[in-house]
């Protein structure tokens, strides 16, 4: 590989693995077996749940113990379960190395507990949405790990999602005009994220009224280069087309801890939000000086205009 780089003489080098090399030198999402047993009343109230999680780490241990911890934390979902037991294990085998992928253990257990909720709803003849709404954690409830819930909005999220897709008006299954088989489904989950941590962004308003966002949050398919401009556009009341993102370059972009753990929208997004709020204040102060009025007599409107008090 080193010789190939020398031969390239400064040009980009592409490394392509063969099939054997792919399995020997790279990683995969760890296989997992999840067994879940749930106690529930006839009216759909959850009373107990026992979960056993078995991760296959492959030949070496990387992030598997942390993935296992994360999965155990989220194994019961965002539900009120007065009696719960979770046993989570990581095994080493002679297989391909497994490690963390998107979701960090939550993707797998969410699939398990939401499929369990659907099966319970089916057996009891209860609407899957109503079963979830009946059991979701709300502010003041105590989760299975002893945490007191403070900012839970799962109920509101479910209700909003159901309203947006017309849940009550749709049958469970149907065929559309083109002959495609269609169905409906709804699910919810909770995830431990990398909080608290530090994120910085730089938001610059240019002379022509366009906006430039500098952030070290890396775009890898999760949509951060779309999300951050959307937050800025909504905050400043300006067109999305007038906002651009700087390429990530650690030499010039502000510090960000990592682009991991579902943290970019919350951390970088809030940093952009606060920066845009500061821009609004600065523009109002400049306008007050320009027109010789008191700063409190100048406001920034939702559609991006600065106006004085009539």
What is each of the regions a protein language model found here?
Residues 3-310:
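Structural alpha/beta core scaffold segments of enzyme domains
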């Amino acid at each position: 590989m080193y010789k190939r780089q020398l031969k390239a003489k400064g040009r980009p080098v592409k490394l392509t693995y063969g099939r054997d090399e792919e399995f020997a030198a790279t990683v995969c999402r760890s296989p997992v077996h999840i067994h879940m047993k749930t106690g529930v009343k006839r009216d759909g109230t959850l009373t107990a749940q026992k979960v056993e999680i078995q991760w296959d780490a492959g030949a070496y241990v990387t992030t598997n113990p942390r993935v296992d911890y994360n999965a155990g934390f989220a194994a019961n979902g965002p539900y009120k379960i007065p009696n719960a037991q979770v046993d989570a294990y990581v095994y080493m085998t002679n297989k391909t190395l497994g490690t963390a992928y998107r979701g960090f253990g939550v993707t797998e257990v969410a699939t398990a507990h939401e499929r369990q909720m659907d099966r319970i709803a089916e057996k009891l003849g209860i609407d899957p949405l109503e079963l979830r709404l009946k059991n979701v954690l709300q502010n003041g409830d105590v989760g299975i790990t002893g945490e007191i819930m403070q900012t839970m909005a799962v109920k509101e999220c479910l209700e909003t999602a159901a309203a947006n897709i017309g849940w009550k008006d749709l049958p469970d299954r149907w065929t559309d005009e083109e002959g495609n088989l269609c169905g409906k489904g709804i699910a919810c989950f909770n995830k431990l994220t990398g909080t608290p941590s530090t994120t910085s962004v730089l938001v610059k308003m240019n002379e022509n009224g366009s906006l430039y966002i500098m952030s070290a949050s890396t775009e890898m398919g999760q949509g951060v280069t779309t999300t951050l401009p959307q937050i800025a556009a909504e905050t400043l009341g300006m067109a999305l087309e007038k906002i651009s993102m700087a390429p990530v370059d650690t030499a010039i972009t502000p510090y960000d801890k990592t682009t991991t753990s579902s943290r970019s929208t919350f951390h970088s997004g809030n940093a952009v939000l606060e920066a845009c709020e500061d821009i609004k204040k600065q523009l109002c102060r400049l306008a007050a000086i320009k027109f010789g009025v008191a700063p409190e007599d100048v406001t920034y409107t939702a559609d991006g205009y600065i106006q004085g008090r009539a």
